[in-house]
């Protein structure tokens, strides 16, 4: 009888030991629950994008755009209509709130390029200098427009980038107001002056100084201004 009781007790003790081992193994099992990983914004900073330019190469019907073109890009087509082949440009404008929140470690898209912000400061004119500013290989943002800040180059003119090319019909009433030469003052040219060598028109039409106005799909006005 004692032997039976001893066997029963031994069996019960063995079961308790096994149960204890099972719980211990469960408690020490590595935690395989997936851990949260930093988002791109948390790890690399946020990305500040410019406001939409509003320029659509496929619908240049009623707008004013910065352009460049060379001698010979104004021509008469096979149907007798004057055309102007241009490169169309845009510049980046940024919301003031976005620029005020910009920090070192963020990225900002300028001229369709993502720029890592490694240094950030403000000069005495309240211009925002990114990575040393335009004079030191970086970028300079200035305010002064309703849209907020925009990027400028070393000569303080807007920093343009090309969107593409377009050939646009020219109105017979086209007027060019040319004030690119301070010594000569403002001069006026007309559509036909682009088609002749005797007009005295000089060719330096670049986005820094030239804009065209398009109305109803036709170039109706052009302005060229002085740039330093």
Residue ranges and their predicted role:
Residues 17-20:
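C-terminal motif of bacterial Sec signal peptides marking the signal peptidase cleavage site
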Residues 1-9:
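Bacterial N-terminal signal peptides that target proteins for export
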Residues 22-24:
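Bacterial signal peptide processing site
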Residues 34-228:
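Solvent-exposed hydroxyl-ligand-binding patches built from regularly spaced Ser/Thr
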Residues 27-30:
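Conserved nucleotide-sugar donor-binding catalytic segment
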């Amino acid at each position: 009888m004692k032997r039976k009781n001893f066997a029963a007790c031994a069996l019960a003790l063995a079961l308790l030991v096994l149960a204890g081992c099972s719980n211990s193994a469960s408690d020490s099992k590595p935690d395989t629950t997936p851990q949260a990983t930093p988002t791109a914004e948390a790890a690399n900073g946020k990305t500040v994008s410019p406001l939409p330019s509003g320029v659509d190469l496929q619908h240049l019907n009623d707008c004013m755009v910065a352009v460049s073109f060379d001698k010979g890009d104004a021509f008469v087509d096979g149907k007798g209509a004057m055309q102007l082949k241009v490169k169309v440009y845009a510049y980046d404008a940024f919301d003031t709130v976005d620029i005020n929140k910009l920090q070192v470690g963020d990225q900002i898209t300028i001229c369709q390029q993502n720029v890592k912000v490694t240094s950030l400061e403000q000069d005495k004119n309240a211009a925002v200098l990114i990575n040393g500013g335009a004079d030191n290989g970086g970028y300079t943002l200035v305010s002064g427009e309703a849209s907020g800040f925009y990027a400028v180059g070393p000569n303080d003119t807007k920093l343009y980038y090309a969107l593409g090319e377009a050939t646009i019909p020219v109105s017979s009433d086209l007027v060019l107001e040319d004030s690119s030469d301070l010594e000569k003052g403002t001069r006026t040219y007309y559509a036909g002056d682009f088609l002749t060598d005797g007009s005295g028109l000089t060719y330096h039409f670049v986005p820094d100084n030239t804009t065209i106005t398009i109305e109803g799909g036709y170039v109706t006005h052009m302005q060229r201004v002085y740039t330093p």
